Design a protein with these regions (language model features):
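Mature N-terminal, pre-catalytic/accessory segment of carbohydrate-active enzymes
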Residues: 1-94, 212-215, 220, 365-369, ...
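Active-site-adjacent "subsite" loops/lids of carbohydrate-active enzymes
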Residues: 3, 8, 22, 89, ...
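Carbohydrate-binding surfaces of carbohydrate-active enzymes
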Residues: 9, 87, 192-193, 197-232, ...
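Conserved beta-strand positions
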Residues: 14-15, 40, 45, 162, ...
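Short, acidic/polar
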Residues: 20-37, 139-153, 235-249, 311-319, ...
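Catalytic domains of carbohydrate-active enzymes, especially glycoside hydrolases
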Residues: 26-52, 154-157, 249-256, 318-325, ...
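An active-site-proximal structural segment forming one wall of the substrate-binding cleft
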Residues: 33, 37, 79, 131-167, ...
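Aromatic-lined carbohydrate-binding/catalytic grooves of carbohydrate-active enzymes
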Residues: 34-72, 95-117, 121, 169-184, ...
Length: 555
């Protein structure tokens, strides 16, 4: 079988072009540097959207003011191919110059009061304002984005990447009309009151329309589509801006792509887990039938400090995980090599890519083999947060148990084939079809591990009379919660139980988990010891640290 170029091992370097550097850019020299010094085999360059990097004929497609008549897109594509590089064209229709807003205000995102949403304001220097565009508006659709993609695809580009692709909260007339048609009600002022699927419906619909235009013209050119591994940093953003459901990616993209930035400028306490880039790559392998995901790693320390780069060993560690977990690597630099303020990163990118180049044959056609499936349910995470999911990852990694992710939408006999055990980390929303597949899996001897609210609701969020897998686990749901269990414990009732192997001589395990009460046919190995004090009073004095209720029998 012939491997398409985007399924082979990739060493992508993105040059995030700054418009002021346009006169300094010699495409042939830049491509030589990327190929010979940084050992890239594919490049990402700006093409259109916020700025046109070629002589566009599309009305309201804002030209790069430093272009001075050049066709930088054409020059760059030709230079890339001369040096044996694949060329991925980057576009961004998420925002546009204020001069366009003044001509076509209906294309832009609005507050409930009808005001536009400025992006990146204030920005020092001689810059005009940028306004967020409406996902459902003409700028992101047939009036600008579609004809711009047609222009870009007239060049011999090898791939397409839409930066900033997301749903933007908007109360414009078009969004109000579509919402009314979809749900028979008015669009609420409060985004928290939007229907659950509104952001996703808007985002996916927009992406599918653009993909149809591109695929009709150049079916050989892959579209890179975003997915995310939810974490605490991204969860609130994804709730309001569309989940980018991995299961929907196949309807508008050919290659899964993610961006697990190591954001040092957020501070140590807000830093992402050390395994985040690797697990992002691993999730990507589950998205589009095993197509290797492309994982974007920013060389900078965060958007606040685009012109300083990550420490060498920090960056190498973040990169290494991507490759180790089956992903293709994409480095992002701010500017071309000759305009780098922090040039230390160039040696790191070059040496790391050279290592991958030497071992390219070993990295080709890899498969992820693991006995354990961890179910990823984006809808459940949206409802309950990512804590159970992230905690499951942490536990399996710490115990060095190999696992693969399985999308909730792939909970079928075929999807479960090859696994010995399936872990459901609070997969609250579970369809009847998925439940039946899990029951058959268990009947064949497969192991099931489920936590908290797994199976409490159907796939639409309707609460079930009993949790979907209650019969398999031998429990009945009492239907109410014990929350705020800080300063509580789990009492060890059966130290010989397999779940507690190696726990040692202790009666208590620390606990602060919310509890969904159940009753069961079998004795629980752990039961609740309720809090001995409120969180405010737990620390002092030690003379009052005794536990008033030693045993409840609550599992």
């Amino acid at each position: 079988m012939t491997t398409r170029w985007w399924q082979a091992p990739l060493r992508i370097v993105q040059v995030n072009l700054q418009v002021v550097d346009t006169p300094l850019l010699d495409p042939d020299e830049v491509m030589r540097q990327l190929r010979e010094e940084l050992h890239a085999n594919a490049v990402v360059f700006n093409a259109g959207g916020i700025y046109a990097f070629y002589p566009t004929q599309v009305p309201h497609h804002f030209p790069n003011p430093y272009l001075e008549g050049r066709d930088l897109l054409g020059e760059s594509v030709e230079a890339a191919h001369r040096h044996g590089l694949k060329y991925i064209a980057r576009v961004d229709f998420s925002k546009a110059d204020d001069s366009i807003f003044h001509q076509r205000p209906e294309w832009f995102a609005k507050t409930p009061e009808g005001q536009p949403l400025a992006v990146g304001e204030p920005r020092y220097g001689p810059w005009s304002l940028l306004y967020a565009t409406c996902t459902n508006g003409g700028y992101c659709g047939e009036d600008v984005a579609h004809p711009v993609m047609e222009e870009i695809l007239s060049y011999d580009v090898d791939g397409l990447f839409y930066n900033g692709a997301s749903y933007r909260v908007c109360h414009c007339g078009e969004c109000r009309r579509r919402y009314r048609e979809a749900y028979g009600e008015e669009l609420p002022d409060d985004p928290g009151q939007f229907r659950d699927d509104w952001a996703q419906r808007s985002f996916v619909g927009n992406m599918q329309a653009i993909h149809r235009v591109c695929h009709a013209l150049r079916p050989d050119v892959p579209w890179l589509g975003h997915y995310w591994l939810p974490d605490r940093m991204m969860h609130s953003v994804l709730r309001s801006h569309g989940l980018r459901l991995p299961a929907a990616l196949g309807t508008y993209a050919d290659v899964p792509c993610s961006e697990p930035a190591d954001i040092l400028n957020a501070g140590y306490l807000e830093k992402r887990p050390s395994w985040y880039s690797g697990m992002t790559a691993r999730l990507g392998r589950a998205v589009l039938g095993g197509v290797p995901p492309i994982v974007i790693i920013h060389a900078c320390t965060g958007m606040s400090w685009r012109h300083t780069t990550l420490p060498e060993h920090e960056y190498r560690y973040w990169l290494s995980q991507v490759v180790a977990h089956g992903g293709n690597l994409w480095h992002t630099l701010t500017g071309i090599p000759n305009t780098q303020y922090d040039r230390r990163i160039l040696d790191v990118v070059g040496s790391f890519n050279a290592l991958l180049e030497r071992h390219e044959a070993l990295l080709a056609d890899t498969e992820l083999v693991a006995p354990v499936a961890v179910v990823f349910s984006a809808q459940s995470i949206r409802e309950t947060g990512p804590e159970e999911f992230l905690g499951t990852i942490e536990a399996l990694l710490n115990h060095q148990i190999p696992f693969a992710f399985l999308l909730a939408e792939h909970l079928t006999d075929e999807g479960l084939a090859g696994f010995d055990t399936c872990v459901l980390p609070s997969v609250r929303l579970l369809s009847d079809e998925a439940t039946a597949a899990l029951q058959r899996f268990a009947a064949r001897g497969g192991g099931l591990v489920a936590s908290f609210e797994t199976g409490l609701c159907d796939e639409c969020g309707g609460v079930r009379p009993a949790p979907a897998l209650a019969d398999l686990f031998g429990v009945q749901c009492a239907g109410h919660y014990l929350r705020g269990q800080s300063s509580s414990y789990m009492r060890v009732e059966d130290p010989e139980h397999p779940l507690l192997a190696g726990i040692g001589p202790t009666q208590h395990i620390a606990n602060q988990l919310d509890l969904l009460q159940v009753t069961g046919a079998h004795p629980a190995p752990l039961t609740l010891v309720p809090p001995f004090a409120t969180p405010q009073a737990a620390g002092s004095p030690p003379e009052r640290a005794s536990i008033p209720t030693q045993r409840t029998g609550i599992p």
